[in-house]
Amino acid sequence: MSERIVIDPITRIEGHLRVEAEIEGGTIKNAYSSGTMVRGIENIVKDRDPRDVWAFVGRVCGVCTSIHSLASVRAVENARGIVIPPNASMVRNIMQAVLYMHDHTVHFYQLHALDWVDVVSALKADPKAAALLAQQLSPWAKNTEGYFTATQERLKKFVASGQLGIFANGYWGHPDYKLTPEQNLIATVHYLDALEWQKEVVKVHAVFGGKNPHPNYIVGGMPCSIDLNEANAINADRLALVKQKLEEAKTFINQVYIPDLLMIANVYKDKWSKIGGGVRNYLSYGDYPVFDLGEVESYKIPRGIVLDRDLSKVHPVDANSPEEIKEYIYHSWYKYTQGDKAGLHPYEGETHLEYTGPRPPYKLLDVEDKYSWIKTPRWKQEPMEVGPLARLIVAYAAGKEPQKSIVDETLRQLDLPVDALFSTLGRTAASGLECRMAADWALEFFNQLIKNLENGDSRMANSAEWERENWPDHEQGVGLAEAPRGALAHFIVIDKNRVKNYQMVVPTTWNASPRDENGVLSAYESALIGTPIYDPKQPLEILRTIHSFDPCLACAVHLYDEEGKYVHQVDTF
C-alpha cells in the first residue's frame, strides 16, 4: 500500500511551494512539485519606464534581496548597449558576494542545519567536551567551555518553559539524527551565533545601496557617490566599515560555517552522498565579472552546461537563442496562444493566467493535469539543475580555479569520490564552499575599488544613455545573474521607452517546475525519487533533500493513504 505525503506550504517565508510524494515500501516512488502562488510582477511592470523596473522586480523576493534588481538593470543595459564604469562593477560584485555570504550562511544554520542537528540532544552534552572538540576543529574565539555552558543553560530554560518557539515541532530523537550530543551542542551554539552575525554583514548593503533589504541600483551603474574626503558621500570611514564587515564575515565563514559543515558531512557522508542526486544536467550563466560584463572569460563563476554528469566537457549556453531556452506550460496554470504544447523563448513569452485546479481547500492535486503556477523551462528540451552545486560542477568541469582545488581538497578531507557531488550532501556542501570563495572575492573586489579611487577614478555611473530625444521603436535585452539559488535571467522587450514584455526565468522555475509533457521530471521532483523514508509521520529525509536546494522552507505535512484518505498530520519547523 502506498501513502502520499502532502507538504503545503513548503516554506513559510515565501509560502508558495507544495510537494506531494508517493511512498511505497519505505521509498519515494513519485513526487510532484507545485507552485501554489501566482507571480504577477511580470504583468505589473508592463508599460512602465524600463529604468524603473528594477525597483519593482526586486520585491519578488525578500530573501535573496538585490539580485533581481541587478538582473533587471543588466537587462536594460544589455538592450541599450550601456557599459558601466569599473567602480560600479566592483560595488555590484561586492554587494552580490555579501548576498552570497549572508544567504548561504543563514540557509545552512537557520533553514537547513536542524535537518541534521538534534537540538534536544544538545541538552545532554558535556560543555567541556564540546568545547575541546570545537577547539580541535577551529580557532573560533567563542569555542570555550564557559560560552558553551552558558548557551546550554539558556537552551535548558527555553525547553523547560514549554515554549520552544523556533525549535518547536522538530523531529527530535529521530533515529536518523547521528551527531553526538557534543556535536549537536556545537552546531546549536553556532546556530545562535549566526543569528547575531547575519545582521552585521548586511551593513555593507546599507553603505553602498542605502538599505537592506532591497538596496538601490540604477541603470548605468550605482547610485552612490564615493569621495574619500567628503562627509556627505561614501568616505574613508564608510569604506573602512565595509572592509571591517567583509573581514569579519570571512572569519565567521572560515572558522564557524566551514568547520561545522565538515563536521556534519563526516557523520552523514556514507548515506547522504548517495541520495538526492536528481537530474543529471547542470546550468550556470556565470557571474562576478572581473572586467566588463561582456568579457565572460573573466567571470569568477564560469558560464556553461554539464550534461549527463560528464565532467569532461562544458557546453556553451546562449540565453538569447530561441533554439536553446524555452518555457512550457503543459502542467502549469497558464495558456499560450499557440496551445499547451508550445514552447516559447522568453522574448516571446506570455503570462496568461488560467487556473484549472481544484477549488481550495483541497486534499490532492490532479497531477495528470495542470498542477502548478510554475512554468517548465528547458534547455534544448533538457531539464537543468541550477544553484551552488550546478555552479561548482560547471566550474570543476571547466578546470576553473579556485573551485577545482577547493572541491578536491574537500573530497580528500571527507574521503569521498567526485561522484559524491551529485547528492543531497554534495548540494549542501556546495553552498558552504561557494560561501568561502565569496568571502575572498568580496575583499578582492574591495581592494580593486580602493585602488581605482586612489588612482583618481571615482566614476559610479554612465548616464550617457539616460535620456534621449527619440527612443527607438524596439529594443530587447537579457540580464543574466547567478542568484544564491541559481541561474537567473530577466528578459525585457522595450517599445519607445516602455516595457512591452518582461519575463523572468528564475532559479525556482528551473528547480521546482512540474514535469514536461513527456513526463520528464525537473530537479525537485527528480531528487526525491528513491529517497528512503524511515517514518512517514516524520519525513525528515524529504526535508533534507528539498532543503539542500535552499528554498527557505518550513513545512506542514499531511499524510493520506492511496485513496487520499486523511491519515495523520505532522507539523515541522
What does each model-found stretch correspond to?
Residues M1-F573:
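Metal/cofactor-centered catalytic core regions of large enzymes
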